[in-house]
Amino acid sequence: MKERQRKQRMTNNLIWAGVGIGVLAIIGLFVWQAVKTPPPAEAMGEVIPIASADHIPTGSDPGAYSSDPPAGGVHYADTLPAKFYQESEVGSLPVHPEAYLVHNLEHGHVIFWYNCAVLTDGSCDQLKEQIQGVLDEVDGVKVVAFPWESLEEPVVATSWERRYSFEAFDPEIARQLVLANRNKSPEPNAP
């Protein structure tokens, strides 16, 4: 009888020890996750105040934005596909493509606006390859490259309420910008 009680006590002790180890493992997992997960990076670039984010009728003139290129503001109800747009494609797009692209920004996209005309050394193809390389590295998710003739710099990146100017395009900074700014917007869960 005593032997049976001793075995029962030992079994109970082993069960409680197993439960205790399991609880400690779960607590350890939560602590490890909290320490391992870095805080979200602060968005990069100059802050651009947005007066309104209202939808306007498709085809209507969105008017002047608070920055050039825009970092937010009034926009159409539709977006443009996330991709690299060549200068030759702009003429086939609907009127005021910026009003579609501002809606992309509201959905958390990052846009690299580029102007090859300001490059004096004929390095447009290299610039486009570098921008495309960044798009490829982030799998093109919520990233657009778009030609913009009014730029005084070769590239300006915008995200919702942010503007970052590149005097010389740096792919590493561009990648960091995408990671820091993507989805920091009013509608980050929209496609």
Show which residues each predicted segment covers:
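Terminal, Lys/Arg-rich, intrinsically disordered segments and adjacent short helical elements
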Residues: 1-19
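Helix-rich interaction surfaces within compact, conserved domain-sized segments
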Residues: 130-191
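Membrane-interface motif at the C-terminal end of an N-terminal transmembrane signal
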Residues: 27-39
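Surface-exposed, low-hydrophobicity interaction/linker segments
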Residues: 38-100
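Hydrophobic membrane-insertion alpha-helices, especially the h-region
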Residues: 17-30
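Short, well-ordered strand-loop elements centered on a beta-strand within folded domains, enriched
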Residues: 77, 123-128, 156-157
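Mid-length scaffold segments of soluble, non-membrane domains
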Residues: 89-137
